[in-house]
A protein has these predicted regions:
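Strand-loop microenvironment adjacent to phosphate/nucleotide-handling motifs in alpha/beta enzyme folds
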Residues: 1-154
Length: 154
């Protein structure tokens, strides 16, 4: 019995980073990288054709950022996205935009193995995520959406 591989699309404008991510993810027997995009415009065209289970996306790219792309695209097309960036300050923006997780790009080659291991684990977890579309009529951002709050303790 063979299990279905997780189909991943990599979106990154840096050829070096893109190649590293593709090579690292492809080394796992349960993951198949089915394509890549060099920016968000390219991603918008390729995502419907490739139909990935999970997308890894750089945050900072020319044109539209990964975060802006998620805010525009994810409400109508729910796909688990893991944002990848060298900027830790973008973590909350990424999650607020709908990313299921965030991975920090390594600052040096010394941390590459740990980065690939972390990203691979998060891709496998994200593949099981149930991402819901947001109704177009909602008119609220994720930070404005209703949330649960705990009652004060007695």
């Amino acid at each position: 019995m063979t299990s279905k591989k997780v189909h991943v699309m990599v979106v990154d404008d840096s050829m070096v980073a893109r190649s590293m991510i593709i090579r690292g993810l492809s080394a796992h027997p349960s993951i198949e990288v089915i394509g890549y995009a060099i920016n968000t415009l390219d991603a918008k065209v390729k995502i419907p054709k490739l139909n990935p289970d999970v997308i890894t996306m750089d945050v900072e790219m020319p044109g539209k950022s990964g975060i802006d792309f998620l805010k525009e695209y994810l409400p109508q097309h729910p796909i688990p996205v893991i944002l990848v960036s060298s900027l830790n300050l973008k973590v909350f923006d990424a999650l607020d935009a709908g990313a299921v997780d965030f991975v920090r790009k390594p600052a040096s080659q010394d941390n590459m193995d740990a980065f690939v291991t972390t990203l691979t684990q998060k891709v496998l977890i994200a593949s099981a995520a149930k991402v819901r579309s947001t109704p177009a009529t909602a008119g609220t951002s994720p930070t404005q959406a209703p949330h649960l709050s705990a009652a004060p303790l007695p």
